[in-house]
UniProtKB/Swiss-Prot annotation:
Residues 47-72 are annotated as: Disordered. It comes from Arabidopsis thaliana. The keyword S-adenosyl-L-methionine does not apply. This is Late embryogenis abundant protein 2. It holds the Pfam family LEA_3a. It is found in: Cytoplasm; Nucleus. Belongs to the LEA type 3 family. InterPro entries: LEA_3a (IPR004926). Keywords: Cytoplasm, Nucleus, Stress response. It comes from the Eukaryota. GO terms for biological process: response to salt stress; response to water deprivation. Induction: By salinity and drought stresses. GO terms for cellular component: cytosol; nucleus.
Length: 91
């Protein structure tokens, strides 16, 4: 049985060589067309980068640390303090 499967595999390789080449070439052509359609020019990328930078929040100094951070960032809480708060509320 194994011998017949090996022979069938060899015959399928020789018989489907033309078919597989056609399939692979078609796949490559479709991928190349998609890559060309999806490309974006450098000018468009610069324009998008400029739009994104205008939407960012201003940076303000943190009152505790003095380091600058975005204005919209909420204050962080220590995990140990958060655990203590949650455990006290359950009792």
């Amino acid at each position: 049985m194994a011998r017949s499967l090996a022979n069938a595999k060899i015959q399928s390789v020789f018989g489907s060589e033309k078919l597989s080449n056609a399939v692979f070439r078609r796949g490559f052509a479709a991928a190349a067309k998609t890559a060309l359609d999806g490309s974006v020019s450098t000018a468009e990328m610069k324009k998008r980068a400029g739009e994104a930078s205008s939407e960012k929040a201003p940076w303000v100094p943190d009152p505790k640390t003095g380091y600058y951070r975005p204005e919209t960032v909420s204050e962080e809480i220590d995990p140990a303090e958060l655990r203590a708060i949650l455990l006290n509320n359950k009792q």
